[in-house]
C-alpha cells in the first residue's frame, strides 16, 4: 500500500484501526494554522495531494472567518507543492460542488439567479467557485509542477461505496439534484491518483460524480 499523510482538525471520530496504521502519518491541525515550513514538510515527496476541506455547517462556519478557507488552503498547498520543485508533476485533487459551474456550461435563467444569490450571500459558495477558478486560471494546464482535477459531487450523503457515474457536466439542474456518497467521491479521487488513463481523461477538468440509480 501507499504511505499517507493526512491533516485533520480533530481525531474525535477517527477509527482506531487507522490511528494504529503504520503507513499513515496524522498531522492534527487546522491547515491554515500551519507555518510555511510545516506545509512544505506535509507535501514534500507526495505524488498526489487531495483536499476535502470545507466550511462546517453552522452559522459561524458559514459566515465567520476565514470566509475564503478553501481558497486560502488551495493557494498555500499549491505554493508548498511548487516549493518542493519535484521532478514529477504532483496531482492535486480538490473536492468541490456541483453548484459550481464550469465557464460555458449551460444554466437556466432560474439557476443563474439562484447561483448569483448564493455567490453574493453565502460565503462557502463563493469560496468553492474561487478555489476552482484559482486552479483553472492561475495554475492552468501547463504548470511545471502541478496538474489538477476539481471533483464535483452533488448532494453529499453518508453510505457505503456503491456504483457511481462520472460525467463532464451536471446532468440535471440544481433544482433537481442527485445524491453522491462521500465514499464514492473518495473512491473516484483514489482511482484518479492510481490510474494514469483516468487522470489523463480528467486532468484540468471538473468532473461531476453522482450515485448510479438502481433500476
Segments predicted by a language model, with ranges:
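NAD(P)H-binding glycine-rich loop region in Rossmannoid oxidoreductase-like domains
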Residues: 6, 12-76, 80-83
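Oxidoreductase cofactor-interface core, primarily capturing Rossmann-like NAD(P)-dependent enzymes
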Residues: 1-3, 9-19, 34, 56-57, ...
Amino acid at each position: 500500500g501507499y504511505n499517507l499523510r493526512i491533516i485533520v482538525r480533530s481525531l474525535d471520530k477517527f477509527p482506531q484501526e487507522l490511528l494504529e496504521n503504520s503507513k499513515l502519518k496524522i498531522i492534527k491541525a487546522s491547515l491554515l494554522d500551519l507555518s510555511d515550513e510545516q506545509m512544505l514538510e506535509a507535501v514534500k515527496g507526495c505524488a498526489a495531494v487531495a483536499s476535502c476541506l470545507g466550511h462546517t455547517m453552522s452559522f459561524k462556519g458559514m459566515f465567520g472567518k476565514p470566509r475564503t478557507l478553501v481558497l486560502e488552503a488551495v493557494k498555500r498547498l499549491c505554493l508548498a507543492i511548487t516549493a518542493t520543485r519535484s521532478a514529477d508533476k504532483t496531482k492535486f485533487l480538490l473536492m468541490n460542488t456541483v453548484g459550481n459551474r464550469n465557464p460555458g456550461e449551460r444554466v437556466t435563467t432560474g439557476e443563474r439567479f439562484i447561483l448569483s444569490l448564493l455567490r453574493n450571500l453565502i460565503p462557502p459558495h463563493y469560496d468553492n467557485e474561487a478555489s476552482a477558478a484559482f486552479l483553472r486560471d492561475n495554475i492552468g494546464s501547463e504548470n511545471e509542477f502541478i496538474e489538477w482535477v476539481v471533483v464535483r459531487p452533488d448532494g453529499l450523503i453518508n453510505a457505503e461505496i456503491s456504483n457511481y457515474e462520472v460525467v463532464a457536466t451536471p446532468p440535471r439542474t440544481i433544482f433537481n439534484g442527485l445524491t453522491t456518497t462521500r465514499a464514492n467521491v473518495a473512491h473516484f479521487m483514489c482511482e484518479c491518483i492510481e490510474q494514469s488513463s483516468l487522470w489523463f481523461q480528467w486532468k484540468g477538468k471538473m468532473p461531476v460524480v453522482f450515485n448510479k440509480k438502481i433500476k
